């Protein structure tokens, strides 16, 4: 029934799109969306909020959130122009908009009829370290067709830098009609924003049983491995792992490790972790978007997640646990050689893990390395805003 209902919505949206074809697009309307049209997150959220705060803006911006509970919560908290794409009125509004601005490849309505006059603008939700889109390894025929239909809609794609242009070019099916933009990630404007440290402390201090002094003086580590489509992702994947020893070490060094799982994939943690008070879950149900709070952590540990690129803005160290690197390269694949796109210490054992988290030495990142990712803490939203204004060409 669910599949039939979705198919009916797609059929209706495309029929409505055909009906709207003779009418001119509204140059002043921009529609934003994010994952599945049900979330309010990623780069589209931050650019939407930036543009709506510009008093001189002639743009009318709307953000599609089809989750009724979340939409109501956002509206009640003071957000404006948060809409559903399920009503007839809003479908017309969306189909007549000059620009669709997306964090993912999902359109704001189930329409796959491309209008050459419309700007379909891809912001992305992280610099692609892994193969994505049409460049992903081992794509099924059904997924390939689905991606082809969606990807062909885009007119402009953020590729961050010249270093990553070929990556996005392959991901978007080597489409030469797309304009690839060397612009940064809007969400990165929030990382070093004023009072970020206060925000994170107020948000997460209640998650653990720490005294105020203990919490504020602690070394805070964000441990956030990425997804696997072939197995559960393992936290602390060491054959010599000792939870009792880890607990003792964290207490002695006044370290708190915040573990963050990918919201859409399964994870596995070793026994005994649940008894360590200094290991605190910080998943999406507690903190939907961790980006604005990255400056509050002293060290990041990951495996293949692109979140470490955002974290480099803080000029703090990153460590990597590539415990299944060969398998990941074969089944998922990287957009660039792994050792070329990572800069930090590699951890292969529990003893190395303790050494890294207990050591504060860090030599920093080179300018050349940072330029590959177009890493900057300000001006990202503004450059996208100016680009969109230029493309729309308001009178």
Per-range role (PLM):
Residues 42-49, 53, 186-272, 347:
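Conserved catalytic-core segment of nucleotide-activated headgroup transferases in glycan assembly
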Residues 272-277, 306-373:
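Catalytic binding pocket for nucleotide-activated donors in carbohydrate/polymer assembly enzymes
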Residues 29-195:
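Active-site and donor-binding regions of nucleotide-sugar-utilizing enzymes
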């Amino acid at each position: 029934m669910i599949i039939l209902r979705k198919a009916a919505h797609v059929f209706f949206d495309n029929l409505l799109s055909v009906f709207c074809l003779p009418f001119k697009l509204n140059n002043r309307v921009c529609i934003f969306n994010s994952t599945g049209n049900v979330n309010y997150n990623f780069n589209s959220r931050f650019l939407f909020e930036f543009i709506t705060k510009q008093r001189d803006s002639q743009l009318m911006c709307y953000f599609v959130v089809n989750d009724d509970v979340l939409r109501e919560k956002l509206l009640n908290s003071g957000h404006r122009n948060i809409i559903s794409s399920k009503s007839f009125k809003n479908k017309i509004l969306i189909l007549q908009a000059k620009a669709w601005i997306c964090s993912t490849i999902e359109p704001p309505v189930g329409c796959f009829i491309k209008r050459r006059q419309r700007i379909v603008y891809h912001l992305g939700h992280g610099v692609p370290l892994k193969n994505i889109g049409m460049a992903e390894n081992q794509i099924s025929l059904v997924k390939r067709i689905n991606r082809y239909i969606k990807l062909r809609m885009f007119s402009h794609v953020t590729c961050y830098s010249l270093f990553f242009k070929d990556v996005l070019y392959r991901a978007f099916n080597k489409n030469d009609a797309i304009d690839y933009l060397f612009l940064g990630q809007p969400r990165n404007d929030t990382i070093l924003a004023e009072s970020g440290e206060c925000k994170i402390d107020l948000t997460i201090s209640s998650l653990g049983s720490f005294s105020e002094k203990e919490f504020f003086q602690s070394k805070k580590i964000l441990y956030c491995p990425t997804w696997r489509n072939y197995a559960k992702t393992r936290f602390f994947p060491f054959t010599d792992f000792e939870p009792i020893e880890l607990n003792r070490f964290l207490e002695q060094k006044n370290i708190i490790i915040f573990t963050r799982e990918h919201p859409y994939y399964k994870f596995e943690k070793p026994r005994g972790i649940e008894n360590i008070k200094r290991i605190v879950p910080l998943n999406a149900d507690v903190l939907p978007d961790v980006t604005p709070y990255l400056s509050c952590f002293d060290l990041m540990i990951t495996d293949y997640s692109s979140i470490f690129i955002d974290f480099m803005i803080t000029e703090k160290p990153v460590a990597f646990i590539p415990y299944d690197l060969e398998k990941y390269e074969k089944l998922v694949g990287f957009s660039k050689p792994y050792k070329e796109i990572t800069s930090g210490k590699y951890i292969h054992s529990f003893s190395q893990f303790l050494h890294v988290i207990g050591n504060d030495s860090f030599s920093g990142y080179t300018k050349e390395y940072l330029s590959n990712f177009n890493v900057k803490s300000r001006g990202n939203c503004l450059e996208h805003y100016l680009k969109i204004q230029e493309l729309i060409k308001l009178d």
